[in-house]
Amino acid sequence: MDTAKGINIIVNNPGKTIADYLDPSTLPSRNPGAFLILCPTTTGTGSEMTFASVIHFMDTDRKLSVGDGTAFANLAIVDPVLTVELPKDVTAYTGLDALTHCVGCLTSIYNVNPLSEALARDGIGIIMENLPKVVANPSDLEA
């Protein structure tokens, strides 16, 4: 998904390189971008819902976040069936990634508000209840 988002940034902003988007506030996109459909096959990152993507810069062997308005998906298709055959450790680790996003929201010094706090608390509860279930039984689509 991040590769598709990075490509959408570059294709829709001619004359720039992906490195120009390391600080998305400096180059706000005026282009709508191509219609972008993202379909996650793991849980945790939330990349299908953000303007950021993590790109591996091979010249420095570093993974860095880049962002732009053209990286937002027009449509996100989230189908839990796609996660059923993940190895249990990947299911656990990506579930923990989702948990850290919720905790990060609660502990952030930026833009915490009653809605984000309520959603983060709810997310923590859902993850704590369901992550052990889905690791034990990946076919449990309710978890």
Feature-to-residue mapping (PLM):
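Carboxylate- and glycine-rich phosphate/diphosphate-binding segment that chelates Mg2+/Mn2+
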Residues: 52-143
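Glycine/threonine-rich beta-strand-loop-alpha-helix active-site module
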Residues: 1-78
